Amino acid sequence: MSDNSQKKVIVGMSGGVDSSVSAYLLQQQGYQVEGLFMKNWEEDDNEEYCTAAEDLADAQAVCDKLGIHLHTINFAAEYWDNVFEYFLEEYKAGRTPNPDILCNKEIKFKAFLEFADEVLDADFIAMGHYVRRTFPTAEEIANGVKPQMLRGLDSNKDQSYFLYTLSSEQVARSLFPVGELEKPEVRRIAEEQGLITAKKKDSTGICFIGERKFTEFLGKYLPAQPGNIETPEGKVIGQHQGLMYHTLGQRKGLHIGGTKGGGGNEDPWFVGEKDLKRNVLIAVQGKDHPLLKSQGLLASQLHWVDRTPIKAPLSCTVKTRYRQTDIPCTIIPVDDENIKVIFDEPQIAVTPGQSAVFYLDEVCLGGGIIEERI
C-alpha cells in the first residue's frame, strides 16, 4: 500500500470522462477516493439542453463501477450570487466576461473545497482539469517554497487559463491527475476500464449552464436593445440585436456580409468597437484594421498564484483568450491592484472583461481582468 492510503481525496465528478479517469487514477495511486457531484444551476424550464440529470446518472455509474461513494451538493445559490450576477453586470456594462474562470474561483475551488474540508474531512480535492502542479518537499516548504501551477501536458487541452485565480494554498490542496496525460490517453484508460463516459463528448458552453442557445438564454435575463451597426465614418450599414451579443474581433453573426466598404472594399467585417453611449456597434473591414489592434492593455482585479504582487517590470508571455498562442510581453506594475502590459507586437481583438493570464515558460503566474486596450 502506498503512503497515500491514509489520505482522502474528494473528486469533483461531473459525469464527464476527465473526472471519471481522475477518480480511477487516484484510486490506483492508493488514495481513499470519494466523489462529489455539484449541481450549480436550477433549471426554470424544460428545455432539452440541460443535461444535469444525465450527468449525475453517468457520475453515479462511474462511481458504482469504481466502488466509490458519490455525494451530491447543490451550490445553485452560491453560483447565482457569486458568478451569475457578476456575469450579467459585466454584459450590461458592454464587456465580455468569462464565467468559467469565476466559477472555478468561487465554486470549484472555494465552495467545493470548503464543503470537502468541513463535511467530508478531505485531505485533498481533485478535478479533471488539464493542468499540472509542483510538489515541493517538506524541506522546501519549510524554506518558503510554494507549489506552482503548470500548464497541462496536452497543450491542446491545457486549462491553466481558467485556473489563474487559484492561490498556492489552493493548489497545495488540489490534485490534477489527467493534467499529466494527453486526451487520447485519458479516453483509452476510460475505455479499458469500461467506464460509461469513455466516448462521451466534451462539454462546451457556459460553465454549468450547458450548451443552450446563448443569445436566447441571455435574452431571458437582460433586455436586448437593438441599434445601428456603423462604419468608423458613421455610415449605417446594418442593425444589431443588442451590444451584449457581440464581442470585439467577432466576424460571424453581424449579418452585413456582402456589404461593400469605401472604394468597393469587399473585405470581411469585424466588430471593431462598442459605443455604449449611442448603443452603436462599430464594424471595420479586414482583420488588420487599426481599430482591431492593440499595443497592450490595462488590467485590474489581479490574482497572483503565489499571492506576491509584481513590483518591477517583468518580461513574460500572456494569453488574452483561451487557446491563444502565447504573446511575448512586458508587465509594468502601476500599483498592487493594476498593471500595464505592453506586447512585443500589436495584437488583435483584446477584449475588456476577458482575462489576461501570464506565464513564465510552463509556470502560470496568475492574471487579471482586462480593463481597456492601449
From Swiss-Prot:
Family per record? Belongs to the MnmA/TRMU family.
Question: Which molecular-function annotations from GO does this UniProt entry contain?
Answer: ATP binding; tRNA binding; tRNA-uridine 2-sulfurtransferase activity
Write the protein's name.
tRNA-specific 2-thiouridylase MnmA
User: What role does it play?
Assistant: Catalyzes the 2-thiolation of uridine at the wobble position (U34) of tRNA, leading to the formation of s(2)U34.
Q: Which UniProt keywords apply?
A: ATP-binding, Cytoplasm, Disulfide bond, Nucleotide-binding, RNA-binding, Transferase, tRNA processing, tRNA-binding
Q: Cite a single Pfam family from the UniProt record.
A: tRNA_Me_trans_C
**A cellular-component GO term for this protein:** cytoplasm
Q: What class of enzyme is it?
A: transferase
Q: What is its EC number?
A: 2.8.1.13
Residues annotated as region Interaction with tRNA? Answer: 157-159, 321-322
Reaction catalyzed:
S-sulfanyl-L-cysteinyl-[protein] + uridine(34) in tRNA + AH2 + ATP = 2-thiouridine(34) in tRNA + L-cysteinyl-[protein] + A + AMP + diphosphate + H(+)
Quote the catalytic residue positions.
C103, C207
Q: Which HAMAP family match?
A: tRNA_thiouridyl_MnmA
The family database entries (SUPFAM superfamilies) matched by this protein are listed as: Adenine nucleotide alpha hydrolases-like (SSF52402)
* Alphabetized PANTHER family for the sequence: MITOCHONDRIAL TRNA-SPECIFIC 2-THIOURIDYLASE 1, TRNA 5-METHYLAMINOMETHYL-2-THIOURIDYLATE -METHYLTRANSFERASE
Instruction: Give the span(s) annotated as Interaction with target base in tRNA.
Output: 98-100
User: Which NCBIfam families does the record cross-reference, listed alphabetically?
Assistant: PRK00143.1 (NF001138), trmU (TIGR00420)
List this protein's GO terms for biological process: tRNA wobble position uridine thiolation
Gene name for this UniProt entry = mnmA
Entry-linked CDD domains: MnmA_TRMU-like
Kindly list the residues the record flags as site (Interaction with tRNA).
H129, Q354
Disulfide bond sites: C103-C207
> What are the subcellular locations of this protein?
Cytoplasm
Record flagged with keyword tRNA-binding? yes
* Protein residues bound to ATP: G12, M13, S14, G15, G16, V17, D18, S19, M38, G128
